Amino acid sequence: MTQQSTTVNALPVYVGAGQINAIVPSNAPLGRVSVRVTYNGVAGNSSPANVVSSSFGIITVNGAGFGPGIIQNYATAGLAVNSTQATAQPGQVEILWGTGLGPVAQDNVPPTVGNLPVKVEVFVGGQPASLLYSGRSSCCSGIDQINFAVPAGAPGGCYVPVVVRVGGSVVSNTATMAIDPNGAPCTDAANSLGAMFRAGGRLGAALLRHEDDQMTVAGATQSFSADSAALSLRQEAGGVWAFNPYVSLPPVGTCTAYGVAGVFPTLSDLPGIAATVKDLNGGASVSLTGPSGTASLAQTGTPPAVYAGLLATSQNLSGIPLSFFVNGASNALSGTGGADVGAFTASITASAEPTWTNSASAATVTRSAGFTVTWTNAPAGANVVSIIGFNVDPANNVSGGFQCLANPAAGSFTVPALALANVPATPAGLAVVRGWISVGAAQLASPVTFTATGLDKGIAIFGSSSQQTVVFQ
């Protein structure tokens, strides 16, 4: 690692053909440095990196920096890793594992136990936790542990967000933990999808969606609407740490967040999502019939495990109608069946999106301040309002987003600065603004269910949302 005339050597802990894990030495210069690997006397290319005094990273089960964290319940001699079955209770002491609290006196000797001289804050479900220890672990070089007590006001749930802030301003990645007031296996009353995914098996999931969009291109705002549908038929492994951003959702009243290296335009593209065991063949034909007619969903993949289609758009595209869904009307999703999944049908009712009443004020969002979303006219059948944001920074090769769930009856929700910390700022001079925020509603507690030979469970959801491009500052 080099900065001008100063060069220090990182401390390798693992070296493989395609990966090197190393500890940044405590005497590394702060600021912009170049990193170069030398092997058998041959130096590779230099890559830029930014070194700061403290920047904590929570270690997660999937190794990707999101989802269930490596957090131990300090309850028994075994110190079970927190999971949807081994939950924590409010007031219980937890041990959180990570790296990046800051430098120590010497890197080449066993770590000294003791708090490191940096301000550390832990937030569980948005609530501040009592800190008991924050320093090096005595087990390993470069590994830090933070001992904290679960706040009394922390919400119960299977994917309660956990965030660490150091030095008063540097926010970690967001991990999750499972909390139950009685230490029983966790439940998510507002979201049945997570339990289905954890149970695993042969699953069918359909999403019918209406969205109203506003997009800024070269300073001009374009508005359009779109109706779409998608169905996936897959065998999932499940498990107590299974995590998928689309179904492993935070408790109502909280937010989870994602920040990763790379340009990933949607949550489904994030690395670290559990791999599907098997794609299931549902046959050649899946269709959707409503008041506006019948549309076919195109197959994707081999075997055809995913069926998707743009049903309508106001953009006047050739061969695609202007609208498909009618609020309050039923739509029949039907499949003829195939080698793995038999014939099925499901009836789903369309509904309008909430009215996002302060959308104009969200055209620019200051990440350090957070922002409040207000709405009216949430659909009567919805049990959650979902607020999602995402942004990419191609120049710095980073992506980040957040998702919050709110009570539809509340009419407002404040997305905290902690949830926005890992959303990259919008680069100046972009012709097309790539950041966006969506405000929508759905019924996740009691979705429509359907059955078919070869499926353990099938669910169908109608979601409606308003989405607009946003400049994140």
Spans of model-derived segments:
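Surface-exposed loop/turn and intrinsically disordered segments
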Residues: 293-372, 377-379
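Exposed regions on extracellular, virion, or secretory-pathway luminal proteins
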Residues: 249-256, 263-295, 300-305, 363, ...
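Solvent-exposed serine/threonine-rich low-complexity stretches and specific carbohydrate-binding patches
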Residues: 5-15, 128-138, 283-285, 289-313, ...
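Ser/Thr- and Asn-enriched, surface-exposed coil loops between beta-strands
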Residues: 16-18, 142, 302-303, 350-352, ...
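Protein-protein interaction regions
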Residues: 454-458
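A sequence-level detector for low-complexity, Ser/Thr- and acidic-rich stretches
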Residues: 1-278, 368-374, 379-395, 400, ...
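Exposed aromatic-hydrophobic patches
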Residues: 19-26, 145-151, 311-320, 410-422
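Active-site/pore-lining binding-face segments in mid-to-C-terminal subdomains
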Residues: 391, 396-428
